[in-house]
A protein has these predicted regions:
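Conserved aromatic beta-strand anchor motif in extracellular beta-sandwich/beta-rich domains
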Residues: 181-183
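Surface-exposed, short loops/turns at beta-strand junctions within beta-sandwich domains
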Residues: 204-211
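Flexible loop/hinge segments at secondary-structure junctions
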Residues: 8-151, 175-179, 220, 224-437
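Surface-exposed loop/edge segments in extracytoplasmic proteins
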Residues: 186-194, 221-223
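Short strand-edge motifs at loop-to-beta-strand transitions and within beta-strands
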Residues: 191, 199-203
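A short beta-turn/strand-edge loop motif at beta-sheet boundaries
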Residues: 168-175
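C-terminal segment of classical bacterial N-terminal signal peptides
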Residues: 1-8
Length: 437
């Protein structure tokens, strides 16, 4: 950097949504290294409600939120929404008794679990969901390549869609190497793909329930899958929800309201969303546990057998948590397909959304012909000031850089989905509103 560039370096701080925490931790470091500025995002962010209140109070230069700003939450100064990245909200669980099996859950069953009417893991609703989708288990608890994880789903009876995610450092060292779906029983390769610039690599191949399969990255086994007979345990379900004001809760509750049960409200507070409200949650006692922030919720699920919660998928694929047995369920979409929480599946769902003139995104939960969509998704926003200032100029540059450069190259590797097409174009237009007046 030149002396002139360093002299013009600015600091800008943000707080709020924990949904994009893993993305922002990486993006701020990369932006600062490239520009000499000092953009920071609080870790933990405090949740979307805090992001909105900090921004309104002038405590930050930009806010972080995954949910709409209400009239009461709105700042008195002019500001804009800037949607900058999306991601899947994983239905995360740990159930050691099913030995690595991926759960398949319909919206109705998720409604029952999080609404407190399904209280045991062997409930017929869960069993029936599992019967409608082949039960494949990953028997490899720890990936042989740290920083590489895999998701297995079966779009049809004899077809597997395997998605491998590589964190940025592993992606960099693995470029040009091979991802392989290998039939261990028949000792032959089913499908391969070459690793390029994207951190998420999907391969589809024909499979049969009598064989077991390995998913390999450069010969290292990152997952080992086979069909299993599922014996769901007679065990109490512990629901883990966000206790802070959370955009992840807001988007999860919106999914519940639109896809399963209109009695759910849409709110940053889970206890205000659930039918029956906070008194209902209190009546469940210790079977409902509140945790503040995405990391704490994910840690609780990873550390506690029999639990289920909701969190951005990067917190589940994290190697340390994954080794403890936390997994993500496949969720039934409006087209009737059980789909895993991959970046591609999130992007497929977001492609069916609408974005208004303010930059706010409205999802369509009735995409009955979209077989590839994962239906529990959030778009996360920065809240930026339109007034001209040196700090606001940096915020505008930072968000423009994320949308145009950083997210397209790195979001998938970090467990997120970059905005593309009309959504990316709208996001860039919103970023230009920051520092425009």
């Amino acid at each position: 950097l030149s002396t002139g560039t360093i002299a013009l370096a600015e600091s800008a701080s943000g707080s709020g949504a924990t949904f994009p925490q893993n993305f922002m931790a990486s993006a701020t470091v990369a932006f600062n290294a490239a520009t000499g500025h000092n953009v920071s995002y609080a870790n933990p962010g405090g949740g979307s409600s805090k992001g909105k209140s900090d921004f309104k109070a002038g405590l930050t230069d930009f806010g972080g939120s995954d949910s709409a700003v209400t009239t009461a939450q709105a700042a008195s100064f002019e500001w804009a929404y800037i949607p900058y990245v999306a991601g899947s909200i994983a239905i995360a669980y740990r159930l050691d008794e099913i030995k690595g099996t991926t759960l398949s859950l319909s919206p109705a069953t998720i409604n029952g679990i999080f609404g407190g009417t399904i209280t045991k893991w062997n409930d017929p609703s869960i069993a029936n969901d599992m019967k409608t989708n082949p039960a494949w288990a990953n028997t490899q608890k720890k990936s042989a390549l740290k920083g590489a994880s895999s998701v297995w789903s079966t779009p049809s009876l004899n077809t597997a869609l395997v998605t491998v995610t590589l964190i940025p450092s592993v992606l960099k060292s693995s470029k040009g190497k091979t991802v392989e779906l290998y039939n261990d029983t028949k000792k032959k390769s089913v499908k391969t793909a070459t690793i390029g610039t994207k951190g998420e690599i999907a391969i589809s191949g024909n499979v049969d329930s009598a064989s077991s399969y390995s998913v390999k990255v450069d010969g290292k086994v990152v997952g080992k899958y086979g069909v299993v007979a599922v014996n769901l345990p007679d065990k109490a379900i512990t629901v883990v929800y966000r206790s802070d004001g959370s955009g992840t809760s807001n988007n999860f509750c919106n999914f519940m309201n639109k896809a399963a049960n209109s009695d759910w409200a849409v709110n940053d507070a889970f206890t205000s969303c659930i039918p029956g409200g906070s008194s209902k949650v209190a009546s469940f006692g210790s079977t409902f546990q509140g945790q503040s922030g995405s990391a704490n919720l994910s840690n609780y699920v990873a550390d506690t057998n029999g639990t289920i919660g909701y969190t951005e998928v990067s917190f589940v694929s994290d190697a340390t948590r994954a080794a403890k047995g936390i997994q993500s369920a496949n969720v039934k979409n409006a087209a009737g397909k059980f789909v895993g929480p991959t970046a591609a599946a999130a992007s497929s769902f977001v492609a069916g959304a609408a974005i208004d003139a303010t930059g706010f995104v409205t999802f369509d939960y009735k995409q009955t012909t979209n077989t590839t969509a994962y239906p529990v998704v959030a778009v996360t926003y920065a809240l930026g000031k339109t007034a001209k200032s040196a700090k606001n100029a940096v915020v505008s540059d930072f968000l423009t850089w994320i949308l145009s450069t950083y997210a397209p190259a790195n979001a998938e590797a970090l467990g997120y989905a970059p905005l593309s097409g009309a959504m990316q174009t709208a996001g860039l237009a919103q970023a230009k509103k920051v520092n425009s007046k």
